Amino acid sequence: MKYVIVGGVAGGASAAARLRRLDETAEIVLFEKGEYISYANCGLPYYIGGVIEERERLFVQTPESFYARFRVEVRVKSEVKRIDAEAKRVTVSDLNSGKTYEESYDKLILSPGAEPVRPPLEGIGEEGIFTLRNVADTDLSLIHI
């Protein structure tokens, strides 16, 4: 059985770990659009505020450690652009190379996360107004503080 998981932060990483416990022989491929997986996204404000002093403490797993522990193939900087449920294939864009390829699956799990709501307020798009959802948002905020 081959599982493809879209999203590698909280839900996707948890699903992958659970799948491995349930099926030791399954092929599991996890796609994450961002650079990091399985990080403490609830800790991001604490890092900005200095309560968590070391950035590395935000990261629970790396792609390498996740593979070593769970035998899950993790592909970061990989955006799933299209799902063909009938053919059981996803189209993936490798954000490093710009190349696009297809990956087949038997079962698909979607855990792509969310986007912050930006209310239609005057000035919401001005410099110095930030949303906080991921590590990249955190880094951008800290540059301006």
Regions found by a protein language model. Give the residues of each.
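Beta1-alpha1 glycine-rich phosphate/pyrophosphate-binding loop at the start
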Residues: 1-77
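FAD-binding core/adjacent interface of flavoenzyme oxidoreductases
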Residues: 4, 64-143
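Low-complexity, intrinsically disordered or weakly predicted helical/coil tracts enriched
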Residues: 13, 143-144
